[in-house]
Amino acid sequence: MKRLFSIWIFTLVGVVQIFAQPFAFDFSYVGYQQSEKEIPGADVVVFVKWKEGDQSARIQKAIDFVSARKMDKKTGLRGAVLLDKGVFELSQPLRIQTSGVVLRGTDRNQTVLYKKGVDRGAVVYLESEKQMQMLGEPMKLSAPWKLGERKVTLPAGCKMGDEILIVRPSTKEWIQKMGCADFGAGKDLGYWGWHPGEIDVRWTRSVVSDGKGGLQLDAPLSMSLGQDDAECFVQRIAGNDWRLKNVGVENLTIDSEYDATNPKDENHAWEGVYINKVKDGWVRMVNFRHLAGSAVVTQRDASRITVEDCISQAPVSEIGGYRRRTFLCMGEQCLFQRCYSEQGMHDFVAGLCAAGPNAFVQCDGYESLGYSGAVGPWCTGLLFDNVNIDGNDIKFCNLGLEGYGIGWNTANSLAYQCTAAGIFADSIPDGSNNHVFACWAQFNGSGDFQQCNNHAKPWSRFASLLEKRLGRDVSAQCRVLERERNNVSNNPTYDVAQKMVEEARKPRITMLMWIADSARFMASVSPVRAMDVDKIKERSKKKADLAHAGKPVFAIKEGKIMVANTLLKGARMNTPWWNGRVRYSAFPKIADAVTRFVPGMEGQGTTTRVDSVVAHLRDKHVVLFNQNYGLWYDRRRDDHERVRRRDGDVWAPFYEQPFARSGQGTAWDGLSKYDLTKLNPWYISRIKELAEKGAKNGLLVINQHYFQHNILEAGAHWVDCPWRPVNNINGTVFPEPVPFAGDKRVWMAEYFYNIDNPVMRQLHKQYIMKMLDAFADEPNVIQSIGEEYTGPYHFTKFWLQTVAEWEAKTGKHVWVALSCNKDVQDAILQEPELRKVVDIIHIEQWYYTQKGLYAPEGGKNLAPRQYQRRLRPGKVTYDDVFKSVSEYRQAYPEKAVIYSGASAPENGKAVMDAGGSCPNVK
C-alpha cells in the first residue's frame, strides 16, 4: 500500500509540474526588436590593424568614418568596424553616437580592448547626443490599464505610429500605502524614505495596430495603472530619432589596467559597455575582465537591448556598495541571456525604477558576494529565468532602509526555475505580488511560492512565452541549456544505478562552458574589401577648435588677476561636499561637482561630466570654482551617527577624498583604510581636467588642501575622516577611542594642527608637496590652505614654508592664496619671507560690517559658523566691502585681493572699485 501511495504522489507531482501555471505575464517583449528578429550581422567597412601604443584615436577615427556613411534603409545599418587580433591599448573611451554602427572583434578572446588610466568611466559608450523632446501637454488616462494588457484605452490625442511616454507618478498617498514614507524613527529620519515624485515609473511605447482596426501598445506594461492613488498620464514624444538604433559591441574582450599591488584598486575602468538613449542595440559574445563596476549597464533611456553570451571575470574593486553590479539594467525591455559573472556584489540586477519587462535568462553567478534581483527601488516586471546564484540570494522584497531607502525593490516579478542560497519574495501592500516557481533555495517571504524544490516544464519560461507569441520555433536563438530530468527514485534498480554511474562520470556542463561551446559568431570577421583605417584622411579641425588650441595666459599684474590682459570678472561657485540622492527627480537640483562619484551613472547630479561642468560654469559666468574634498565619502553618514558601519555597503553619491585607499584593513566605513602618503589619482585627474578645459573660459580653480569641517563640531564629521587613526595605515596621532564631548561633539583641531609631532609633521609635508606636484603645470589653479580654515598661525606658517621649500626644490611657481583669520593673515604678511610666498590675499573669515570689524581670532578651535553664532556680525554694505578690499590693496599693492566674505555676490562692484580681483560683475 505504501508503495502504491508513493507512486500516486510521484505521478501527481509530475502532472502539477506540467500543468501548474506561474505568474501569467508575458515577459517575452524584451531584447533587440523585442526578440522578434535576429541580431543582424553588419558588413565590415573599416579594418583596424593591431599596432603598439595608444589606439584610442585610430579606433575612434574608424567609428567616426562609419558613422558618416549613409544608412542602409532596409537594414538600418551603416557598417562595422573590425578590430584585428591583438591587445589594443586605450587611453580614452570609445564612443558610438550614430545609429547603425557596430564595433566588432576578429576573435572573442584574442581581440582585446585594454583600457589604461585612472578614469572610472566605461570603455565603450553607446549613447545618443540627442535628448527626448515632448509634444503637447500630458494627457490623463480616462480608464484603468490592467497589468500586462496591450489593448488599452488610449487618450484621444494618440495615433498610429506615435511614440509615447507613460508615467505612473509616486504620490504621497501611494507611498504611505506602501509603508515607505520612512523606514524607522518616524518623521525624524524621513529623508531616508520615499518622497513624492522620486519613485515615478515611466515607460516608452509605440502605438501600433491591433490588427482589427484599433490601436494598442507594442509591449505590455509592468504595472496596472489606475486612478485611485495616482493620476497616470501619457505624453507624445517628438520624433523617434532621439535614440540610437542598431548599434552594438561584439566578439571581443574588454579589459582594464589596474594597480597590481592593490587588490582593491578602483582607479581604473568601472564599466565595460555603457548604454544610454539606445533602442534596439546589443552586446554579444564579449568577455569582461578586471572591471570595478558593471560589465554592461543599460540606462533609463535604453530600451530593447540584448546582452547575450557575455562573461565577466576577475573584478577588481573594494567589496562594498555600488561595486560589481555586474549586469545592471536601469532601462526597459532589456534581455540578458546566457551571461556569467564571477565574484559580483550584485551579479544580475535591475536598478532605480527600471520599467519592465526586463529579463535575466540562463544567467549564472559564481562565488557571489551579494544578492541578485533589484538594487533600486520599485523595479517592476523582472523575470529571473534559470538564474543560478552561487552562495547568495535572489531578493524580490522590501529591503527597507538598505541602499538609501530602497524599500520595495520590485513588484510583479517572477523567479522561474532558479537556484540560490535564499530566495526572498513578498506580496506588496498595493495588491501586487512577487512570484517564485519551481526554484531551489531556502525560501522567505509572503509572496506567491509554487512548486518549491521541483523542476518544471517548460524548462525556460522566457523561451516558452516567446515561442507562443511568435508562433515558431525559437530554440536556436534561445539555446536553452536543459538539464536531463530522469526522475530517478531513491530506490533504483541495479541497471538504473549503473546507468547513473556512467552519467556521473561526465562533467556537468556549466553556463561558462555552455557559453564558450555553444555560442557561434556568424557575422563576417574578414577584412577583405574593408577600408584600412590608416588610409582614412584626418578631418580638418574646426576654426572653433583651433581658436582654443592654446592655453590663455593667466597673470597677476599690478595686483590684479588678469587673463589675456583683461581683468577676470565673474561669480564664485563652491563645490558641494555632502548630501545628494540617487533619484531621477533629485538630479536636476544637485549642484555641479567634479569629485562626486555615482558608479554607473553619468550626468547632472551624478558623476557629472567635466565638459558639462565647464559649460554650466561658463553659462553662469563663474570664474572661481572653489574645490574641496567631501565631508565624508558615504551617504550613510548623513545620519550623523558616530557608529562603525557593519560592512562596506556604502551609499552614493560618493564625495571623494584626496587620499588613495590602501586595499588594506577595514576603515570605519567598511572599505579599506586610506594611505595618506598617496593621492587619490581619480580625484586629482578630475580637478586637472576641470582646470584644463575651463582655462579657455578664464576659469580659476581654488584647490583647498584641507577641510576643517572634519575636525570640529559634530562627532560624525570626524569618524570617517582619513586622518583618524582607525581609517589609515600611517599611524596618525589622535586619541582613540574618540573623546566625544557630550558624547557627540568633536574637537580635534589641536591635534590636527600639531606640527611638533614628527609623524604628523611629515605626513602633512608629504601631502602638501604632492598636492603642489599634482597641479604644478596648471596656471589657473590657486593653492589654498583649506576650506573653512580658522587654524592657528603656526600651522599657516608651516604650510607656507612647505610651499616655499617646494618652489625652491622644483624651480616652479604656483599661485598661493592666503585665506585665514585676520590676525593670522596680518601676522603672516608682516613677515617678508612668508609674504613673498603669497600671491593672493583672500578675505573670507573676516570683513567690515555696519557694526564694525568682524574679525574672530584664529586658532581658537571654533568653526566659522560657531564664531558667527557667538559674535553675530552685522549687515555688510558696499562701503564695508570696499573698505575690506581697499585696505589690503593699499597695504600690499603687488598682491591680488579676492573677497569672499559676507554679501560678496551682491557687492562685486565694491570689490572692483576697490581694486580687487574676480569681482562678481559682468
Regions found by a protein language model. Give the residues of each.
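Glycine-rich beta-solenoid repeat tracts in large extracellular/virion proteins
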Residues: 93-97, 109-128, 153, 237-242, ...
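Active-site mouth of glycoside hydrolases
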Residues: 555-829, 833-840, 864, 868
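Extracellular "leader-to-stem" segments immediately downstream of a signal peptide or signal-anchor
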Residues: 3, 12, 18-262, 436-539
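Catalytic-core region of carbohydrate-active enzymes that cleave or remodel glycosidic bonds
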Residues: 385, 401-423, 807, 830-922
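Right-handed parallel beta-helix
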Residues: 100, 109, 168-204, 208-210, 245-335, 348, ...
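Mature N-terminal, pre-catalytic/accessory segment of carbohydrate-active enzymes
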Residues: 20-29, 44-47, 51-55, 87-88, ...
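C-terminal, active-site-flanking charged/polar segments
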Residues: 379-388, 403-465, 912
